[in-house]
Amino acid sequence: MEKKIILFHGSEKVIEHPVFGAGKKHNDFGLGFYCTESEALAKEWAVSSLRDGFANRYTLDTEYLRVLHLNGPDYTILNWIAVLIEHRLFSIKTPVARRAKQYLIDNFSVNVNAYDLITGYRADDSYFDYAESFLNNAISVEQLSQAMRLGKLGEQVVIKSQFAFSNLKFEGFSIAEKDKYYVQRKARNDEANQTYLKMLDDETDGIYMQDIMRGGIRSDDPRIPRNLSE
């Protein structure tokens, strides 16, 4: 990561002074200020079907920040999933899913609050549905890894600590038009869902959540995909 980076935050409003401690604690990586290095992605995340939005632009000095790269080679796809299910709210409908959630948190989760900055892929609702299917033993870890590559997941940069917030400087904003960016986001999501449904028809002898729990599989097992960028 460069010493000084440019970040964009998609929002329905202009945010000149992001506030430490504000936001939703049930986002992907918990409480924080969610950004991306892609202006186009920020614009997609800023709009809805009914309104335009804004891509707020910032610079961030990262020189002395503790940075967690969740999609780097030191972590598996299950580390990423464990962090998601530890923070996101969702209904658990089966005993298998309940045990699976706890197993992943106990054995694969990462303490994101020990870092100033986190980089990792953003899980839109469709992608979180894939994670739920994995928890319910409906798809294998190999299928999960393949599903998470569908639709070109965007990488988000999350500012976690007060120190990191103090290094963030507002530089301006640009308008995100819903007629362009909502259409782009929806098209990518629809394509990913269609490909996912086709993938489910393929036979697989992969590793399922039940296998992981019964076998006591941990992060260092070479059968678990290391990260989403591979």
Spans of model-derived segments:
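ADP-ribose/NAD+-binding catalytic cleft of ART/PARP-like enzymes
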Residues: M1-D28, N56, P225-E230
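Extended catalytic/binding region for NAD+/ADP-ribose chemistry, centered on the ART fold
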Residues: K24-S49
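Residue-level preference for alpha-helix termini and adjacent loops
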Residues: V14, V19, D28, G32, ...
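Ordered hydrophobic segments in well-structured contexts
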Residues: I5-H9, F33-Y34, A55-R57, Q156-V158
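Compositionally biased, low-complexity linear motifs
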Residues: E44-L60
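Conserved NAD+-utilizing ADP-ribose enzyme module
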Residues: E2-K3, S49-R51, T62-E230
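Short, flexible loop/turn elements at secondary-structure junctions
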Residues: E12-K13, E39, T62-Y64
